[in-house]
UniProtKB/Swiss-Prot annotation:
Domain S4 RNA-binding: 91-151
Pfam families in alphabetical order: Ribosomal_S4 (PF00163), S4 (PF01479)
Purpose: One of the primary rRNA binding proteins, it binds directly to 16S rRNA where it nucleates assembly of the body of the 30S subunit. With S5 and S12 plays an important role in translational accuracy.
Gene designation: rpsD
A GO-annotated cellular component: small ribosomal subunit
Keyword terms of this UniProt record: Ribonucleoprotein, Ribosomal protein, RNA-binding, rRNA-binding
Name used for this protein in its record: Small ribosomal subunit protein uS4
Coiled coil: none
Amino acid sequence: MARYTGPATRKSRRLRVDLVGGDMAFERRPYPPGQAGRARIKESEYLLQLQEKQKARFIYGVMEKQFRRYYAEANRRAGKTGENLVVLLESRLDNVVYRAGLANTRRQARQLVSHGHFTVNGKAIDVPSFRVSQYDIINVREKSQKMNWFEEAQDNLADAVVPAWLQVVPENLRILVHQLPERAQIDIPLQEQLIVEFYSK
C-alpha cells in the first residue's frame, strides 16, 4: 500500500483525531466528512479496532506492510505488546526530529530526514524510519545549518516543549536521546490495546 499523501484534514476528520498537529480546519469540523458526518453510527468492535490501527499508521506516516513489521517486533518483545508498539513508532528518527521542534509536522520531518539533513552519531542518515537508541546524538549537517528553515527553527528552539527523554541544544542544532520513551511520556491519543486486538484475530 502506497503512503497516503492526500488531504491531511480529510483523513483527520475520518479518524476523528488531529493527525497533523494544530490543524485549524479539523478543529472547526472534528467529525467525519460527507453528508452523514455528524450522524451517530453504531460502530462495530472490528471497526473501532481498524480505526485505531489506521490512526496510528497515519499519525506516524507508516505504510501497512511496515506497520505489520512493527507490530510483529512489538509482539516478540517482553512487556505489553501495545506499549512496545507505540515506543517503536515514537523512536523513529523522523518523529524525534518532530518532537525536538526542528519540524512543524511529522510529514515535514520525514522530508527533512529523506533529504539528508541529519547525522546520527556522526553518520549521515536519510531513512525516516531509522530507529534511535539511548545516548544517540543527532545533528543537523553542517552544510544544512545555513538553510533558512533551520536558522528560523534555531531561533524558536529555546521555547520548544521537548519530551523529557530528549534534550535539544539550540546553539548546535543537536538532539540528545537520554533514554527511549516510556508509554506515559508519549502524548498520543491512541488506544493501542485495540490494535493488539485487531491483529490477534
